[in-house]
């Protein structure tokens, strides 16, 4: 059998909890919050790329 390491002891609880469902909503609101923050971040990047948001010290030159 394999050798036990500190890393395997640290990761074992994550593996033993795999497949178990937390009652109720669990961490769904937290996931929704992070998805919303990611959406806002990507939206800001897109607006900078399309020059919808004009930043004085920042310019985007694509192509020639």
Swiss-Prot record:
Gene3D superfamilies: Photosystem II reaction center protein H (1.20.5.880). It comes from the Bacteria. GO terms for molecular function: phosphate ion binding. It is found in: Cellular thylakoid membrane. The chain crosses the membrane at residues 29-49. PSII is composed of 1 copy each of membrane proteins PsbA, PsbB, PsbC, PsbD, PsbE, PsbF, PsbH, PsbI, PsbJ, PsbK, PsbL, PsbM, PsbT, PsbX, PsbY, PsbZ, Psb30/Ycf12, peripheral proteins PsbO, CyanoQ (PsbQ), PsbU, PsbV and a large number of cofactors. It forms dimeric complexes. PANTHER family: PHOTOSYSTEM II REACTION CENTER PROTEIN H. NCBIfam families: PRK02624.1. HAMAP family: PSII_PsbH (MF_00752). This is Photosystem II reaction center protein H. The gene is psbH.
């Amino acid at each position: 059998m394999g050798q036990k390491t500190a890393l395997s002891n640290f990761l074992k609880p994550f593996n033993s909890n795999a497949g178990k469902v937390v009652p109720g909503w669990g961490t769904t609101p937290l996931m929704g919050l992070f998805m919303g923050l990611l959406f806002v971040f990507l939206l800001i990047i897109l607006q900078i790329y399309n020059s919808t948001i004009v930043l004085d010290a920042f310019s985007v030159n694509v192509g020639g």
